[in-house]
Amino acid sequence: MTGSAATSMSRRRLLQGAVAGASAAAFPWHWQAASAQATPVPAVSNAGWNDLANRLDGRLLREGDPMFAAAMEINATRYAATRPEGIAVCATPRDAATCVSWARETGTPFAVRSGGHSYAGFSNSSGLIINVRDMAGVTVDPAEGTITVAAGVNNADFGDAIEPYAVYVPGGRCPTVGLSGLTLGGGWGFSCRHFGMTCDSLVSTDIAVASGELVTASETENADLFWALRGGAGGNFGVNTSFTYRFVPTHDVTYVSAVWTGGDTAGVVDALLRMQVDAPNELGLRMSVRMKSRTPLSQPAPYVVNVLGVYWGEPEVVRELLDQVEEVQPASRLRIEKMPFASARSELAATTPEGTYQLKSGFVEGVLPPAGLTTLLEGLAAMPGVPSREQESTAAFFCWGGKTKDVAPDATAFVHRSADFLFKTEVLWSPTDDPDLIIANLDWIEEYYAAMGPYLNGGTYQNFPDRSLENWADAYYGANFPRLVETKRAWDPDNLFRFPQSIPVSL
């Protein structure tokens, strides 16, 4: 066990108390939703809120407004118990600046929200939510080779808007994730080995900073801020209102999906990892290893290895690469198909975890040694499982390396440049599940992550924020953290933009 008996008991009491409340929203485990904004909300009068409403081009939603409940919704519902006093639905960049100024004047805590997909609930607040989701617009400039995107655009909006132009900016696969958060935290996608991270394609961004000013950050204008905004994670330096990226042309690509069930799982995983490390940069895969959790009446289930991805080239190359893996064990299912990039994008689309969950991530350099493969598989088999979710224990390996390594770790705030894979594992549950079983699963994921620790490099992906991390600053930002603090102090000296894992103004 990673926690003491006393800690487990306190978790159990928290869970039992939440169950007694019979409210799904009031059921977070020991990282309470209320801690998403620890600053007490000052007593702002209705007149004060009306003042904000009158200054907006958009709309201010308050409790009782028919749109308020829908606007409150976030992906990580374990943090949904925190209810804001107001939600500013920004229509213009000026609205974002107005909200920042008003929050500073009134002392109201706030959070910035675009897609609402913060795994740790950092886009929620008990005060004001500055919501940029309605700021939607995509402008393609073929002559300049750039695309300018408003802050509320998500992956689905973006893909649909640029499809007629046959161009692309490296990005994620979840349709409802906002490009704002994706970019600010680095930005993984299936093409990262070929084109780099999303933040590596960023040319400039407009942002409402703590002073209430709207400024532009680029290599030639406010360069210190631009450095920090490429990997420093969202909500730390201001409210970004637009992003301009360099685009790349698209063409037909090769889509690949494969499944291996049972058999020599360790051998298959090892072969897949080794193949990817040495593969051309044009190949981008996500590999997962799953095992259906046991129940008292079930028999041990076989491991299932899934591979999904794209190759920016011909199918024959993919077949040759996968032949290395099929020498270990033939795939149960295999699909290799050349198709238009837009079709591949649709095939690759998937939602992120939703509801109540806990997620852990880390980076792998090279491949797992035999002991690491054993730990990987034995750990998955040890997961208790939660019946309500028909849970499968899962470990995923996202492609890394390639062009992501071509950028120096200190060239941008995104420090994770030496890895070959991003490792992720997660556990999901329902508020109706037995508290003891939920605790067992949460203890399991901490133990599993600790056991995998010797095979990870110590970093954690800042776009997969994790409130349980003790040394989050080093895990997210590594050697870049002191410079981020310096930039924070220059642009937000009063620490206006703050949340439990926000960049501070001093070390």
What residues fall within each predicted segment?
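Soluble FAD-dependent oxygen oxidases
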Residues: 2-507
